[in-house]
Amino acid sequence: MVTFPSALRAISRVRAPRTAPLSMNMTRAMPIRRTLATSKDPLFLETPNASDDVFQPLDTFLRRHIGPRPHEINHILKTLGYSSIDEFVDQTVPEEVRLPKNAVSDDAIVALSESELASRGGEIANKNKSLRSFIGMGYNNTTVPPVVMRNVLENPGWYTSYTPYQAEISQGRLESLLNYQTMVKSLTGLDIANASLLDEGTAAAEAMILAHGSTNGKKHTFVVDENVLPQTISVLRGRAKGFGINVVVRPLVRDGNAQLPADVSAEDISGVLVQYPDVNGSLVDWEPLVKEVKGLGGTVVAATDLLALTMIRSPGEWGADIAVGNSGRFGVPPGFGGPQAAFFAVSDSLKRRIPGRLIGVSRDANGRPAYRLALQTREQHIRREKATSNICTAQALLANMSAMYAVYHGPVGLRRIAARVHALTRIVHAEIEALGYHVSNKNFFDTLTIAANAEKVHAAAVSAGINLRHVSPEHVGLSLDETVTLKDVHALVGAFAQAAGKTGTTSEQIVARSRELGLDASSVDTLEIGGFNRTSKYLEQPVFNKYHSETDLLRYIHSLQAKDLSLTTAMIPLGSCTMKLNSTSSMQLLSKPEYHAVHPFAPLDQVEGYMELISELERDLATITGLAAVSLQPNSGAQGEFAGLSVIRAYLDAKGETQRNVCLIPSSAHGTNPASAVMAGMKVVPVKTLPDGQICLDDLRAKATKHKNELAATMITEPATVGVYFNKSKEAFNIVHENGGQVYLDGANLQAQVALTNPAIMGADVTHLNLHKTFSIPHGGGGPGVGPIGVAAHLKPYLPGHPIHATGGEHAIEPITAAPWGSASILTIAWAYIRMLGWHGLRTSTQVALLNANYVADRIKDLYKVKYVGKHGNVAHELLVDVAEFSQYGVTVMDIAKRLIDYGFHPPTCSWPISTGLLIEITESEPFSEIERLVEAFRLIAEEIQEIKDGKLPKDNNMIKNAPHTIESLTGEWDRPYSRERAVYPVPALRANKFWPPVSRIDDVFGDRNLVCECGSVEEYA
């Protein structure tokens, strides 16, 4: 009898958290070791029972995380012809890169139970000091409506779904993202907005690249006002290098007028970036500058604030071409840097160059309106090195939160929130000036810059529990938000009074001051900001004006959720996407205010908890990759690629090898690889892939030798994107090293490496990891993501830095993202996942993921062509099925994908990495019953194809060609050559539990030809 993998028979140590009861802490003197080798262990049973050691916790995570039960794993092994999991792994993972059994200590990462993890997470959270942060700088506190917090952020129906490439089963979140686009378009006054970007800094960088591209790359100067957010300026400088753009930072307001600097060649200006309101809080009339820039053929970019835009003129009204910013203050807390959804809106002339994902309206096969991703041919997975951006992951979940915030409050509610914030800022302005201080900015919305002895003011503020912005020794800044109360205003004014050596104002006096200023409740709604007052209407669409009670919004949220297939519904077998369990225990820390309410620029002595968690996660990831150091800053896999290549670029430049700019990339690589290489200023040279999916070493050697003096790097994904390990990865990496290049190992498929092999043993210099794949951060319907990089020791000095908090090495490159540690709040999820599994749990997860994929490959190999297998006939963690042979019967990849929806599944990855392929990945979390259900679906679809082949069904009118089938299609006239029952209940079990797609197959061509990217009434689309 084969038992659960040896990884489950490891010995782990119980570590009592500091906050545990005394009785638990007593175990420190006599450590308890968990012995998991006996048949009585709960991991080996369907139901937990007493183990040999009564002190062992029963809420261990591994047995909940792994889908197949031990007897089912034995069945899978027997089916595949193996007597043990170790024998299977030895035949799957190439020996030359396989980690020796004892290469990593059992105690390198000690597993905690779910309750121990919760206790440890709370202990760390309590080390973060809960001061009120009025720092601003693009990050503000917000009141998250509980109905949105509970039913979107904390709802697996929203956070476990994938990017909506399969539009028929994504109508709910597509509608919500369309609401987001409409919200941004309306408030910015521009013509079209995308469905979110990663953060404000990277959005501004995308705008800079768009402006550069609009001149066909002929103009190389991008002018930035000195009062743009400092982190944005740093991100721009880092991004500009690869494109040869010169970022010029200058004061663009002189003598009270906005104008271009005299010392910059006007003929070379591609665009200008201004902040509105600026970092100091000032509102500037940018219209004269806009006219000047446009007269030169340049592009004007405005970084702006959505809440302020409910009161001040929109960028579109004063002539901006692009508006970017952060929508976090619409119901998404700062999270020590994120995640929050950045927005990006453009004028009509730029709509086909807009980066990121774009939601549009099309129609389905029945002529009904339906939502879809529009203009997908712009995206990097299609255009590769010709793409204008490498953006892949965005911030869909957070964009949906912000959209729901706007839906809940509506235009009137948003205006009221903004007016209250502005009124409180006026009151603070008056009180501070009454104390003898001078406020530097005359026109403002929510931010003030005050001339003062900064050291004294900051000391007084911190003692009052308040953080202010560090501007200079002679100035401090403050920024108010919707969470501010009378108590906060009293404490804030009191701190300035204390610093001035004066008596503080009482709360009653502050209330009296508000009345003197005419700022009572009845007048706030009619407040205006002189000279900048917005008169145009916004958010007039029905969706923003009808769901203002909690019951209404709750039902609206759930009506959208019901239209989408998520992991709460079924398996999502997307190859190269790793849709594994996002456990409740991993997600719980995210909801704690000690994590999500922290400002990213809070003093480091106030965030000791975050620093401890970040340090532990960096250490764990270094252990897993075998590399020397890790940066958690990149907030997507694509950003990780750019970061890793930029680190390589900096290292080579420091060696004086600036001529090295060639990047060798296999033709089978994901499209982000060539797009990222181009962004990093490299020239892409493709390397051939052999018919068996392996890299052609002869071609690699020839091209590495040919470009020996110019070779900078190679980018290789291991296992390959075709679903197999490379047999000679060490040899391939040595070829590159021998010719002076660095090896970038794309971590997209790290799922098949963890604790079995690693980038270091293969010889990689740098890798990125997708925490939203391998380490269980949810995909969120298209983001958030985290893409940290690990580097070898020689690259450590070049890890990304930051202008506010020092990160990275002594020769740090410019920041990749706006926040020092990226989307820090969701690092808690990956940290929890790793800590609950421990080293051996991680190993077991990888083993079972490999096993599940090979089981599916074995079960369907006689019905479909499994395109690639490894040396011993196995695949890695995913399998590529080639359905080209069915085209002669009129059946395409997309036909099979849509038919799988009728069986209750999300389709696999379609038409990639080959156009006729289905890339299937089965994670370790999927129950054996669900795996069997998928196998049965493929078997029955093969039978349906056989009926077409035999002439029993016409090629153009069958259950595959007409899939997916909706309830509406059943209730109408039925003239199809197959029964309704076969259409929607191809297996009996679907009668008891069926996911019904809300629309039939969508017409993509019609949607792109008739581009509509904002919401309205259904009648408008008909």
Spans of model-derived segments:
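TRNA-binding/sensing appendages of the translation machinery
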Residues: 80-97, 320-325, 764
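Short, surface-exposed loop/turn segments at secondary-structure boundaries that line and modulate
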Residues: 95-107, 200-213
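Proline/glycine-anchored alpha-helix kink/cap motifs
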Residues: 208-216, 238, 395-407, 826, ...
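Conserved PLP-enzyme active-site core in the AAT-like
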Residues: 172, 202-370, 432, 436, ...
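Non-catalytic terminal extensions of PLP-dependent enzymes
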Residues: 2-75, 91-131, 143-159, 165-171, ...
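A conserved hydrophobic secondary-structure block that centers on an alpha-helix together
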Residues: 183-204, 218, 222
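A structural preference for short, hydrophobic beta-strand core positions in alpha/beta folds
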Residues: 194, 249, 302, 441-442, ...
